Amino acid sequence: MAPVPGSGLAKGLAVTLRTMTRKTVTEQYPDAQPELPPRTRGVIGLFEENCTVCMLCARECPDWCIYIDSHKETVPAATPGGRDRSRNVLDRFAIDFALCMYCGICIEVCPFDALFWSPEFEYAETDIRDLTHERDKLREWMWTVPAPPALDPGAEEPKELAAARKAADKLAAQQQPDQPGPDHPGQPDESGQEGRT
């Protein structure tokens, strides 16, 4: 059956007439800030202490908007006769948010939890060069990162944690033998007499 000419127009007018009498729901932004979900993708924050300069984030970034510079530093041996170690030291960590497409791959591949999503999204600039945030600016965004959500009280404990807890309880039980004394009724105390019952 062919559609009746003008039926689309009638449907559109019907929707308009139905919603015309309802109360408006205009958000008064920026006076009223929106309620953002905890995992909102805003700006990326850097927790510099966790960064080991492994370069995974820069290599996996599809936009190549992460710039990292580092140098190697020799750390003396911790014990006499030990070997000196070399480690990477972070010189520059920058993200160009003019290029970033907010895919989150850099955050997912970071094995040391050095990058986090912040819900902040109001960082517009008048000059495009100011959208390249250096490590000091990225560190400032860490203050806006929300705490991780609480665990569900009804959730099962992870297998590894349950096994570790069971082993710790077993070890504590072995290290704490029952000692007879006046605190335990019916058992002999230090004088050899039976305790009160």
Curated annotation (Swiss-Prot):
UniProt cross-references to InterPro entries, sorted A to Z: 4Fe4S_Fe-S-bd, 4Fe4S_Fe_S_CS, NADH_quinone_OxRdtase_chainI
- Chief site of localization: membrane
UniProt-listed Enzyme Commission number(s) = 7.1.1.-
Does the UniProt entry include the keyword 4Fe-4S?
Answer: yes
Its cellular-component GO annotations read: plasma membrane
Residues binding [4Fe-4S] cluster 2 are: C61, C100, C103, C106
Pfam families in the cross-refs: Fer4
Write down the chemical reaction(s) this protein catalyses: a quinone + NADH + 5 H(+)(in) = a quinol + NAD(+) + 4 H(+)(out)
The protein's matches in PROSITE patterns, at most eight in alphabetical order, are given as: 4FE4S_FER_1, 4FE4S_FER_2
Annotated localization? Cell membrane
| Region feature (Disordered) | 147-197
4Fe-4S ferredoxin-type domain location is 42-71, 91-120
Q: What does this protein do?
A: NDH-1 shuttles electrons from NADH, via FMN and iron-sulfur (Fe-S) centers, to quinones in the respiratory chain. The immediate electron acceptor for the enzyme in this species is believed to be ubiquinone. Couples the redox reaction to proton translocation (for every two electrons transferred, four hydrogen ions are translocated across the cytoplasmic membrane), and thus conserves the redox energy in a proton gradient.
Q: What PANTHER family would the database entry show?
A: NADH DEHYDROGENASE UBIQUINONE IRON-SULFUR PROTEIN 8, MITOCHONDRIAL, NADH-QUINONE OXIDOREDUCTASE SUBUNIT I 2
Query: What is this protein called in UniProt?
Result: NADH-quinone oxidoreductase subunit I 2
- Organism, by scientific name, is Streptomyces coelicolor (strain ATCC BAA-471 / A3(2) / M145)
